[in-house]
Amino acid sequence: MSKFPSVRALDQLLDDLGAGAARRRQLDMVRGELNRALERDALPVGARRSLRRLLEEEALGPYVRLAESGTLRHRRVEGGLPPTSEATNEIRRRCVDLLREALGMPALRLGGGEIPLQPAPEAGTLSALARQLDQYLAGAMSPAQTRLTALLAVELDTAGRSGELAVLRTNDLGKDNAAVYIERHPQGGGAVEGEWIETSALTRAALGRWLDVRKDLVQRAHGTTRLWVSLWMNHDGVLDDDGHTTIRPAGMPLEENGLVTSYRVGRLRYDGLRQLLPLKLEQLRRAVDADRQRTAT
């Protein structure tokens, strides 16, 4: 285990990504190089504690230069530390971008400036997303994919903000999941407005699959009416006087940060989503909202 909190947070992120074996080896290479760069005091001090600071351009610039020079190799090659190959350099850059995207940060073209944020999807892309979700429903899905599929389907119907989605409860669903009640909280403040929204066949099916998974999880956690719940045991992040945290079982309410994280991780994990989803859930919400306004006129 690394002595640096930022690298320990990176380890957790890598586990959450669920990358394939080949990609995980590449990501582990980057993880090792970043840890060695920190041990050399080659990166900003803030990068030791914060994963976000570790993945900012201020830290990644010197890291990439050191790594490409061969200084961060974990073993010598013919007695020396030669520069890494161009193929390895390209893999490193791709891994860095993947890690940044998993945190909701824009990709970087290191040495060539930032790549702008991916624009909000157009109506055609939203339709393609719905078709992709429908394909998921036709096959077997993990609990995480089942939850994300239901979340995205609800988003396509409601254009709800992440906070509005996070507080949904099972009693906010109509009979046979034919409608969902959502309370709008305007970003600039103002009166809260609630409305019932008719759901699509896609959303009804996706919610049905998720509710079956959710039922078993909630029973083990002694029950909650929140629609979105955690899939695995975790901790509440608060230290007691002895430096310990409270363990939370699976089936506990998923807070807004957890919901957003599930979106970011799922976007990278499941086939077809990276090309269809923007970096942030809020960008998807705006696209859905714009599409709803177009069809209403």
What does each model-found stretch correspond to?
Residues 1-17:
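N-terminal DNA-binding module of tyrosine recombinases/phage integrases
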Residues 176, 185-266:
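Basic, alpha-helical nucleic-acid-contacting "clamp/cap" segments
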Residues 13, 33-34, 99, 210-213, ...:
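Conserved hydrophobic/aromatic "anchor" residues
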Residues 131-162:
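Basic, Lys/Arg- and aromatic-enriched nucleic-acid-binding interface segment
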Residues 249-297:
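Short, basic (Lys/Arg/His-rich) helix/loop patches that form interaction surfaces
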Residues 16-107, 199:
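Non-catalytic DNA-binding core/recognition domains of DNA-processing enzymes
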Residues 104-137:
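Flexible interdomain linker/hinge and immediately adjacent N-terminus
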Residues 155-178, 297:
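Short, charged phosphate-coordinating catalytic segments
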